[in-house]
From Swiss-Prot:
Substrate binds at residues 14, 46, 78, 92. The gene is coaD. Keywords: ATP-binding, Coenzyme A biosynthesis, Cytoplasm, Magnesium, Nucleotide-binding, Nucleotidyltransferase, Transferase. This is Phosphopantetheine adenylyltransferase. InterPro entries: Cyt_trans-like, PPAT, Rossmann-like_a/b/a_fold.
Length: 168
């Protein structure tokens, strides 16, 4: 078991896809920590639009400006991933009060599983507070413009998904 280091934070999620809200959170967290690991969860039960490898690539492209940010995919229990990374902080984003109940429950469970790790909540800048990956996927699936919510590489990836499904 690794020793928890409070200068290392893990920011987990499915990032299906990564949004400008996620990027904003990492942009604000990166100066606070020696290292931020963006953990891209496999999450097959969520039926992701993009495969894990592609979600990792898109996150790496979007966050490449940060020398202290690393993007890694994982398919294990989050508590195990956090320990493997040696992190002492688990970062979570709160967009609205509606996120709080779920996030509070998750933080409580994680406190039991990894008591040496603190959960830290960050809120996005106001202009990103309404963006969610699920809304972005739905807008893209229906042919809407998501360019204001995600990086250009994600717009292209979602367009490719839509086109490939249209051919089936």
């Amino acid at each position: 078991m690794s020793v928890a280091n409070s200068r290392i934070a893990v920011y987990p999620g499915t990032f299906d896809p990564i949004t400008n809200g996620h990027i904003d959170l990492v942009n604000r967290a990166a100066p606070l920590f020696e290292r931020v690991v963006v953990g891209v969860a496999y999450s097959p039960s969520k039926g992701p639009a993009l495969p894990l490898e592609r979600r990792v690539e898109l996150a790496q492209e979007a966050l490449a400006a940060h020398a202290n940010v690393e993007v890694r995919g994982f398919d294990t229990l989050l508590a195990h991933f956090v320990r493997d990374m040696g992190a002492g902080v688990l970062l979570r984003g709160l967009r609205a009060v509606s996120d709080f109940e779920y996030e509070f429950q998750m933080a409580s469970m994680n406190r039991h599983l990894i008591p040496e790790v603190e959960t830290l909540f960050l809120t996005p800048a106001e202009q990103y507070s309404f963006i969610s990956s699920s809304l972005v996927r739905e807008i893209a699936r229906l042919g809407g413009d998501v360019s204001g919510f995600v990086p250009a590489s994600v717009v292209d990836a979602l367009r490719q998904v839509r086109e490939s499904r249209a051919q089936v």
